[in-house]
């Protein structure tokens, strides 16, 4: 190791996808589903090398015979044994590195419980023996990746949506708002409205088909009522989708009805404000002096902000809520699916960041609670 720079590893553990790679790269090397699958039936064919669990793409491809579980729910780790399997898979199978040789930067959801950060830190140092470790808030990293230090980030992934106002590189905790409504809920919502058409998707494997339909065909309407009217009069928006068994299904107004729930959570039976209203509420919780800069730097991040039409709709809704003379600007970078990871890659390769790592030695002296003093 003498004098040679060792690349840090950056791992963004999302509720739906895990993004991993090396600091300094401009995109993650490995992107795979954050899921662990276990066989539903006893293996009977000897010599097939059946495993008791599968992770990521392998679990995805064998989903027909597995029960799939996501260890991260609503952005927060709920099953540590499965989480450890995912990290093990990330290091050894995806990146093919020895974790004891590389500093590791992990990401976490805003307002992550303290005990979770400690557990993360403990597993990294004790199970994987990493030499150095750091944990960073996802939304802050997204803002870095857009080249800003001030702005408000709407980060919506598979498990949770957050609105995080950030000023001069620090998140403003009193303004952080969270909505437990994200990609996974939209997938469930879509499968519910598809069942009204007589298409039923019930197993955890079939749920993945609905996710694919959502990612390929859904979009956000600029004016929902208008779009509903148009779609009832013409079949212009109808699209067909071929299922794995060759059956072709047709989907129409479901294309924009599913993502509409982001703006109207009541559609899902949730008593929450939509992403537009929540962004506005978050700005209003911040000091008057910073609001103008927040309105002018609304940054979208995460896979659930990838729907066509979402930025235009957001611009329209926020402009209607904001003071009339206010300049509202929505920034929706094309790579926003990975912007958290990209921000982590930037951060971990800064020369000024190198003294920020928690070292193995510091961990051995202070224990897991050191994470609260060094990472904020």
From Swiss-Prot:
One of its GO terms (molecular function) is hydrolase activity. It is found in: Cytoplasm, Cytoskeleton. GO terms for cellular component: cytoplasm; cytoskeleton. It comes from the Eukaryota. Pfam families: Actin (PF00022). Keywords: ATP-binding, Cytoplasm, Cytoskeleton, Hydrolase, Nucleotide-binding. It catalyses: ATP + H2O = ADP + phosphate + H(+). Its main location: cytoplasm. InterPro entries: Actin, Actin/actin-like_CS, Actin_CS, ATPase_NBD. Its EC number is 3.6.4.-. Actins are highly conserved proteins that are involved in various types of cell motility and are ubiquitously expressed in all eukaryotic cells. Belongs to the actin family. This is Actin.
